[in-house]
From Swiss-Prot:
The keyword Ribonucleoprotein appears for this protein: no
Organism classification: Viruses, Duplodnaviria, Heunggongvirae, Peploviricota, Herviviricetes
Species per Swiss-Prot/TrEMBL record: Human herpesvirus 2 (strain 333) (HHV-2)
Name the UniProt record assigns to this protein: Thymidine kinase
A GO BP annotation: DNA biosynthetic process
Active site residues of this protein: 84 (proton acceptor)
The protein's Enzyme Commission number: 2.7.1.21
Binding-site residues for ATP, renumbered to this chain: 56-63, 217
Gene: TK
Enzyme class: transferase
């Protein structure tokens, strides 16, 4: 069922929302995960942490919305923005990773290199893309306790607003590159197997935007090394739609092993996630990420999925099930998007931290990340 906890959990966000005035009312979905799946554990006297992951296809408006949010809130110690690690991607981890990715796809599309050659480059580049997220998640994880829900939960002592969750580079973009022919399904599942366990209080904000407007926004923005690739745009939009459907499928009782036989291997159009879908019907497995992996490369001679790949799909289900999913309507002004995000935070779930010093350590971690790898 939809989770309605959290009205008292984000006072700074709430105050900014009230100060920003009325909007046109286009907000986003309520969280799709059941309330209380992870009740507060540990010392109830310890402070709470709210983590918000703004994710979705590139060019939809995530960074602009986050910038509007931070500007509205103003400088404060209890809210920290964690940007994309562009300096790591372009300098520290490798040289011009984004340029390498787009050029490799372009060369593959023109027939200048083979799919195998492209896959080698893409897989290596995607490791670079995922490293900052995976490392940061690992350092943060020991500080995250159980979910703090109910009237006794205090307001967050610290809120982190992340530009993307680790699943972007460990699941969504590898899957999109697979759809583009520049990564193998085996490589995609290798990344999935490395997805870290989902910590309590993972509030994931995806988004919807008409494709024509999305393409127009992407064409107008300037990012280092980026090409306007409409085929890739369609692929990544499809993957994020599948992601939203998969979370809802799992949280509404879907079991991929039981439904696997319904897959035929023929891809169909994927329904867009509905921002107002709080506790709707069970999505079909055909409309989830599981459908991408019923392909000959992963099947044994008898037609069954090899056990090793099935175990990876179990990992995928395990990682997605606990997420608190929100869907933001980006088809409005930056201020409208900001206000919609502010309203969404009322339903987000914080967690207790694990030590008295955790809040200070987490704040320092986030600021170090932003300072060291968050530049352009």
């Amino acid at each position: 069922m939809a989770s309605h906890a959290g009205q008292q959990h984000a006072p700074a966000f709430g105050q900014a929302a009230r100060a920003s005035g009325p909007t046109d009312g286009r907000a986003a979905s309520r969280p799709s995960h059941r309330q209380g799946a992870s009740e507060a554990r540990g010392d109830p006297e310890l402070p709470t942490l709210l983590r918000v992951y703004i994710d979705g296809p590139h060019g939809v408006g995530k960074t602009t919305t986050s910038a509007q949010l931070m500007e509205a809130l103003g400088p404060r110690d209890n809210i920290v923005y964690v940007p994309e690690p562009m300096t790591y991607w372009q300098v520290l981890g490798a040289s011009e990773t984004l340029t390498n990715i787009y050029n490799t796809q372009h060369r593959l599309d023109r027939g200048e290199i083979s799919a195998g050659e492209a896959a080698v480059v893409m897989t290596s580049a995607q490791i670079t893309m995922s490293t900052p997220y995976a490392a940061t998640d690992a350092v943060l994880a020991p500080h995250i306790g159980g979910e703090a829900v109910g009237p006794q939960a205090p307001p967050p002592a610290l809120t982190l607003v992340f530009d993307r969750h680790p699943i972007a580079s460990l699941l969504c973009y590898p899957a999109a590159r697979y759809l583009m022919g520049s990564m193998t399904p085996q490589a995609v599942l290798a990344f999935v197997a490395l997805m870290p366990p989902t910590a309590p209080g993972t509030n994931l904000v995806l988004g919807v935007l008409p494709e024509a407007e999305h393409a127009d926004r992407l064409a107008r923005r300037q990012r280092p090394g980026e090409r306007l690739d409409l085929a890739m745009l369609s692929a990544i939009r499809r993957v994020y739609d599948l992601l939203a459907n998969t979370v809802r499928y799992l949280q509404r009782g879907g079991r991929w092993r039981e439904d696997w036989g319904r897959l035929t291997g023929v891809a169909a159009a994927t329904p867009r996630p509905d921002p107002e879908d709080g506790a709707g019907s069970l999505p079909r497995i055909e409309d989830t990420l599981f459908a991408l992996f019923r392909v000959p490369e992963l099947l044994a001679p008898n037609g069954d999925l090899y056990h090793i790949f099935a175990w990876v799909l179990d990992v995928l289900a395990d990682r997605l099930l606990p997420m608190h999913l929100f869907v933001l309507d980006y088809d409005q002004s930056p201020v409208g998007c900001r206000d919609a995000l502010l309203r969404l935070t009322a339903g987000m779930i914080p967690t207790r931290v694990t030590t008295a010093g955790s809040i200070a350590e987490i704040r320092d971690l986030a600021r170090t990340f932003a300072r060291e790898v968050g530049g352009v």
